[in-house]
């Protein structure tokens, strides 16, 4: 047995040396150390009201094994939040960059209504589906994350935004060439180009949602399956195709009914995000080792 102040000193000493601490307790004397720990754990059955109030987590069954499951669930939720944020920020950055490039060269690549559709329809369902992704195999093998680390993905968002933007501009150039026999972007006015750019960006973001199932690991090695993500991706793809192919919707959005050749090119450009991101992940894992 030790005094309450000794428990607090032990917790503070570990934290001062950069370790993540967890403290369990059930009595009033445990409250100070539970409050000072990174994760304060109170007992739901035998614990006092004081310890329950200061604790970050309360064990309803007083079973220490429950702590492991709770930590794993917390890590899974945190991972999924980061995945969804990275997915959405990368998509939004690509839209900003694409519009910026088109402004420099004096042409319209995507109209406001197109961007609104991508944000509300194309991105919405996959982002929600990423929130229910199962935990990765190495979830409990990782070291505790640094509390100072932000929830944003940093460099990954930047390169992914640039990648999607580049693919979108290339798609516009190809569509412009089909319509006007030129790849020039200066003052270009092409309904073919706008349609292919919209389709490429939309599908690239749909494919990218599968990349985001793991921020560092290969998606081809994941043992679990996210059926909700598959459903969300298929729904987004159907809606995106419908807005281009259904005449009254296409007229409302200013799209041209593209042929199978243009559709295949857009699909190929969009799908390229999967192997490209896989290569980047491979390099990141090699550097980390």
Regions of interest found by a model, annotated:
Residues 1-22, 42-216:
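Membrane-embedded transport module
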Residues 1-29, 35-39, 81, 102-103, ...:
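Cytosolic catalytic headpiece
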Residues 30, 46, 60, 185-186, ...:
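Generic signal for short, ordered secondary-structure residues
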């Amino acid at each position: 047995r030790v005094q309450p102040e000794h428990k607090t000193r032990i917790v503070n000493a570990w934290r001062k040396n950069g370790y993540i601490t967890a403290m369990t307790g059930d009595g009033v004397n445990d409250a100070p150390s539970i409050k000072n720990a990174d994760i304060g754990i109170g007992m739901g059955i035998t614990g006092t009201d004081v310890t329950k109030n200061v604790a970050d987590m309360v064990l309803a069954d007083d079973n220490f094994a429950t702590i492991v499951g709770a930590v794993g669930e917390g890590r899974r939720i945190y991972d999924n939040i980061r995945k969804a944020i990275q997915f959405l920020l990368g998509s939004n950055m690509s839209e900003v960059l694409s519009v910026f490039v088109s402004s420099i060269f004096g042409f319209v690549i995507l109209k406001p209504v197109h961007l609104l559709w991508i944000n509300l329809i194309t991105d919405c369902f996959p982002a929600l589906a990423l929130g229910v992704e199962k935990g990765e195999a190495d979830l409990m093998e990782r070291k505790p994350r640094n509390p100072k680390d932000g929830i944003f993905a940093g460099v990954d968002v930047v390169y992914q935004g640039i990648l999607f933007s580049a693919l979108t501009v290339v798609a516009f150039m190809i569509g412009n060439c089909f319509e006007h026999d030129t790849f020039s972007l200066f003052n270009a006015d092409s309904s073919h180009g706008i349609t292919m750019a919209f389709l490429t960006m939309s599908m690239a973001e749909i494919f990218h949602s599968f990349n985001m199932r793991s921020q560092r690991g290969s998606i081809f090695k994941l043992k679990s399956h996210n059926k909700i993500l598959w459903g969300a991706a298929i729904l987004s793809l159907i809606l995106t195709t419908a807005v281009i192919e259904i005449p009254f919707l296409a007229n409302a959005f200013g799209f041209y009914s593209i042929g199978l050749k243009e559709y295949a090119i857009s699909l190929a450009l969009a799908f390229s995000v999967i192997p490209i991101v896989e290569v980047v992940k491979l390099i990141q894992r090699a550097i980390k080792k």
